[in-house]
Amino acid sequence: MPDDSTAPKRILSGAQPTGQLHLGNYLGAVRNWVSEQRQYDSYFCVVDLHALTVPQEAAELRAATRRTAALYLACGIDPERSTVFVQSHVSAHTELTWLFNCLTPINWLERMIQFKEKAIKLGEEVGIGLFDYPVLQAADILLYEPHLVPVGEDQRQHLELTRDIARRFNDRYGESLRVPEMLIRKEGARVMSLQDGTSKMSKSDPSDLSRLNLLDAPEKLRDKIKRAKSDAVMGLKFDPARPECTNLLTIYQLLSGESPEAVEARFADAGFGRFKPILADLVIEYLRPIRERYDAIAGESGYLEGILREGALRASKVAGLTLERIRDRMGLLPPF
C-alpha cells in the first residue's frame, strides 16, 4: 500500500442509474458527500454496471446514467474537488472483479441477504451478475483504496464482504490492500416512503407516490405530499407508534435545520391539513436550486461529457496503479 499518511483520507461512494434520485437519497447520502468534499479526497461513481444485474432498456440506461451524473453536480458535487465518473468507463472494475472471483468462496456470496431477496422477486430471470454483485462492489471500492466508505444499513453486509476479500487477499499475497472502514450515519439515513412509514423511500418502489424525486415539478411534489399517508390525530410529534407522522416531521426537520424539539413545539397543536402545505412549500423551495442547476447542466452542450471524461481519466490512473500491484502479486505476466 502507498504511504499517504500526509494526504487527506479518501472516500468513495456511488449510486445506480436506475429510477430517479429522490429526497431520501439526497438526505441520506448526497448531501453528506457535498459537505465533506473539503475534508476528503472524494470519488463519486455512477455504477451503471451494477444496474445491468437486472434487465434494462439500453436507451433508458444511457439517459439515466447521464441524469444521475448531472444530478451529482446539480446537488453540489464540485468536479474541481471531487472525481466524478461512470463505472463502466474504467475497465479496471471488471478485470479486478474476475481476479477477486478467483479468490472469493461461493459460500460467502450465498450468505448475502440482498441476493436472496431479489432472487425471489426475479425467479428464473435471476442472473449470475446479481449473485456476483457484491464482488463487483468490492472491486469498485478496493481499486481506489478508500479509508472510508459511506454505507447504509442495507449495504453493511456487502461492505463486510469487501473487507473480508481484502483481508483474504492480504493473507494470501502479502499486505497489498487497505481494508476500508465503514462510515455509517444515523441522522437522515432513513427517510421513509410517503405511503408506508415503515419502509424506506426507494427508487424501486412501484408507486411513484412513495417518493419525492429531486427533479419532480413543484406541483407534483405538492400533490405527493398532500396524498402522503397520515393519521387523524391532532398534534404532530415524533412517535414510533405513528411512523408516517414521524417520517413527515423528519423530512421537515432535516430540510429546515430545526431541532426535533423545535419542530414538535411548532406543530404541537397542528393537524396534517395545516402541516402538509407548509411541508410542501419547504420541499419545493429546498429543491428548486437543484432543479435549476440540473437544467443548466443538461442544457450546456458537452459540459457533462467533459466532466465525465476527465473523471474517468483521473479514476483510471488511481485504479490502474492498484490493479497493476494486484496483478503482480497474483503472478500475472505484465503486458509487453
Curated annotation (Swiss-Prot):
Keywords: Aminoacyl-tRNA synthetase, ATP-binding, Cytoplasm, Ligase, Nucleotide-binding, Protein biosynthesis. ATP binds at residues 16-18, 24-25, 152-154, 191, 200-204. Gene3D superfamilies: HUPs, Tyrosyl-Transfer RNA Synthetase. It comes from the Bacteria. One of its GO terms (cellular component) is cytoplasm. A motif ('KMSKS' region) lies at residues 200-204. It holds the Pfam family tRNA-synt_1b. A motif ('HIGH' region) lies at residues 17-25. It is found in: Cytoplasm. It catalyses: tRNA(Trp) + L-tryptophan + ATP = L-tryptophyl-tRNA(Trp) + AMP + diphosphate + H(+). Its EC number is 6.1.1.2. GO terms for biological process: tryptophanyl-tRNA aminoacylation. It is an enzyme of class 6 (ligase). Homodimer. Catalyzes the attachment of tryptophan to tRNA(Trp). This is Tryptophan--tRNA ligase. It comes from Gloeobacter violaceus (strain ATCC 29082 / PCC 7421). The lineage of its organism: Bacteria, Bacillati, Cyanobacteriota, Cyanophyceae, Gloeobacterales.
